[in-house]
Amino acid sequence: MVSPDDYLLMSGIQHFSFCRRQWALIHLEQQWSENQRTAEGRLQHTRCHDVTLTEKRGDLLIARGMRVVSHRLKLTGDCDVVEFHKDPNGVSLQGRRGLWQPMPVEYKHGRSKVNDADRLQLCAQAMALEEMLVCEVSEGEIFYEETRQREHVSLTPELRSTAQTMADEMNRLFARGYTPKSKPGKHCNACSLKELCLPALYQQADPAAYLREHIEEGAP
């Protein structure tokens, strides 16, 4: 039986949705390469996760860097922000009067995307909050630094099903120690691991010849 201490990182579902190979290189092979976008994003998350900034504004309680775990997904991680709104249908919180409805807020450096990678990470956080607080979390929000706008996300059954399916696949691949092959596409240009992944290698009819050619080019 897997211990919660050994659960995979919840943030990995965003990597997994973007590219399964990228996820494996980061979370399985422990490889990482930072570019300007990832560095700026890391600094942004450092600010979000300052737990000393927990605050209360009237009927709104803001918790930063809140640790969450989902036994159903076998994922764990930190929510950038969880907003607790005072609500008669909410849940009780230790040390707080009244009832509170949780809503996760994920912070991202760029702008809203067509794919659901960011939304799936938010959904996984919500599913973890539901397990921990025994409540229903039907919505969340993503704040995009580049546009300075929040995107409201409805946590639909379809999004939840996709999150569960991906979490299951992540755990299976991790247990096998398997790194998927590259599937080159436009998304590779935005990937910080492009030089480690070598997606161009998988587009060659003869990968061995491709490697020999580039080794010879770099030879003194």
Label every model-predicted segment.
Residues 1-104, 204, 213-220:
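Metal-dependent nuclease catalytic cores that hydrolyze phosphodiester bonds in DNA/RNA
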Residues 3-6, 169-185:
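Short, intrinsically disordered, charge-biased short linear motifs at domain edges
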Residues 9, 17-21, 121, 159-166, ...:
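Alpha-helical structural motif
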Residues 12, 149, 207:
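Glycine-rich, flexible loop/turn motifs
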Residues 16, 27, 162, 166-169, ...:
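Residues that form generic nucleotide/phosphate-binding pockets
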Residues 19, 178-220:
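Cysteine-cluster motifs in flexible loop/terminal segments that predominantly coordinate metals
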Residues 77, 83-177, 189, 193-195:
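Nucleic-acid nuclease catalytic cores
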